[in-house]
Amino acid sequence: MEASVILPILKKKLAFLSGGKDRRSGLILTIPLCLEQTNMDELSVTLDYLLSIPSEKCKARGFTVIVDGRKSQWNVVKTVVVMLQNVVPAEVSLVCVVKPDEFWDKKVTHFCFWKEKDRLGFEVILVSANKLTRYIEPCQLTEDFGGSLTYDHMDWLNKRLVFEKFTKESTSLLDELALINNGSDKGNQQEKERSVDLNFLPSVDPETVLQTGHELLSELQQRRFNGSDGGVSWSPMDDELLAQPQVMKLLDSLREQYTRYQEVCRQRSKRTQLEEIQQKVMQVVNWLEGPGSEQLRAQWGIGDSIRASQALQQKHEEIESQHSEWFAVYVELNQQIAALLNAGDEEDLVELKSLQQQLSDVCYRQASQLEFRQNLLQAALEFHGVAQDLSQQLDGLLGMLCVDVAPADGASIQQTLKLLEEKLKSVDVGLQGLREKGQGLLDQISNQASWAYGKDVTIENKENVDHIQGVMEDMQLRKQRCEDMVDVRRLKMLQMVQLFKCEEDAAQAVEWLSELLDALLKTHIRLGDDAQETKVLLEKHRKFVDVAQSTYDYGRQLLQATVVLCQSLRCTSRSSGDTLPRLNRVWKQFTIASEERVHRLEMAIAFHSNAEKILQDCPEEPEAINDEEQFDEIEAVGKSLLDRLTVPVVYPDGTEQYFGSPSDMASTAENIRDRMKLVNLKRQQLRHPEMVTTES
């Protein structure tokens, strides 16, 4: 009986072998009755199956049956006990009926068991769950009865199913393997061939069965001890229940038969494989030396452009694709031959090595030719790519040189010059790269004759060489023309830089001169408090005028230079119509203001000098001091100077400009008036000396 047949019944857990043992090493059979009515037929089937598992030796030690009646009725318990007598009378040595806390009528139950004792053939005792340890050790009881033994019914059932499946499959597989192996050991070659066709493959995979067996054996060996706290807990999957030696014996037999089966398969496979290898080797060799070589002989050009080279590459890839299929066959054949050589059969070694050498020579030669052709086309594609990039760079540079631009300022000219230099440098780098690519391609072409298969490729090579050299020479000429044009443009740009610089500096000179004029009118307003200070101011003013004169002369020189540069560049000077009039206008204004400033300072010097002579006490010159004309002259100069301070500077265009602010002019005028008052006071003293004496 197999567990898979009665699986639904076994899942109900009507009875089970927990793996625990009594004090006589007899197995403990547990029947957990429940509130629901127990199906006695199913219980009987379950008991039959469970009692078929242990070995005869184990059965001889007898069973201790625990009937858990705590959730059942007495009549059910009695029926089960009686059924045990019918099912396993010889194997049962003790039946422990676990009673509930509120048990049935003790007299009735005691009377009934005592009455049936001789007929049952085994001892039946009624015991509470907590008193079971009097008959069975706690470590052999499950947790339901207060013990420490762990039992998982579904786990046990699953392992049991695996065990039975393995036993069934391994037994069937052993028969099949024995039939195959025995058929291979006897009979003639024809019978062997026939046996290969009919019985060569077993119904199940031996590897799978062996793996299942090893996993099962490992599980059995590991589950023998799974206790805790130093106690030993016997699992229901130990060697006494599931016959661990039986699994080991089946595995040993399977390994032996499977090893023989593998050898039979290897020998048969080797014979068939050798014939297939010979046939495939000749197919590969014949194709590579025939159609494959013809395809390569027809391809020698490199193309005259990127598109042409790409088309040739695409054609070559198609050829490589066809070859790759045969190379894949070669790799597979080489692996097969190597495997057969490693087998070490002397009778096949010479033939296999010869086939391997012939195949390798042809394939490597053809692969080298394909690689050479691919490298040549790749080099040609790179050469044409560099040539195209260089041509585009030259076109861009030439287009830039052919456009006559009018830069707005020197910065844009510098940027244009920098861009030209960068483009020219990029062209130099591109041309150098083209030469390197071209020389590498020429070197490869010179080696092309070695792969010619006897074909004269002189014409094809000459066309390729002429094309490469022609491209490089053409690029060199175009680059030289661009360099010449760049030199011309560079000279023109530098002249334009000078032109803009002169214009900028001339405009700056106008600004400086305007600033000097502004400073003259706003800050150069003092006339001095005495003659000495006024003379110092006049000297400073002359130096100030020298600076302005230098600035004006510098601006004129710059504008003259712009005229010369414009004539050289054949362009209209912007400065001659704008900057020069402004420069002359500002200079004219500065000249007028400067002359007015000089005139005022000279008048101030004359005024202060005469005033100081009168105001100083000079007894050596009494006649001079008493000269009324001098007083009149001083007074006239002072008044004239005061009037001059109120007069603005008038420019040629009619505009007027005052020196300083009104407060500045008032301060200067007040100083002059004070000096005039002192002179008048001195005059009065000289006219009426007695007034001075009386006052003193």
Curated annotation (Swiss-Prot):
May act as the primary docking protein directing membrane turnover and assembly of the transient receptor potential channels TRPC4 and TRPC5. Binds phospholipids such as phosphatidylinositol monophosphates, phosphatidylinositol diphosphates (PIP2s) and phosphatidic acid, but not less polar lipids including phosphatidylcholine, phosphatidylserine, and phosphatidylinositol. The binding to PIP2s is calcium dependent. Might be involved in the plasma membrane localization of CTNNB1. This is SEC14 domain and spectrin repeat-containing protein 1. Keywords: Repeat. PROSITE patterns: CRAL_TRIO. One of its GO terms (molecular function) is phosphatidylinositol-4,5-bisphosphate binding. Pfam families: CRAL_TRIO_2, Spectrin_SESTD1. Spectrin repeats lie at residues 275-378, 381-494, 500-602. Interacts (via the spectrin 1 repeat) with TRPC4 and TRPC5 (via CIRB domain). Interacts with CTNNB1. Called SOLO because the encoded protein is related to but shorter than DUO and TRIO.
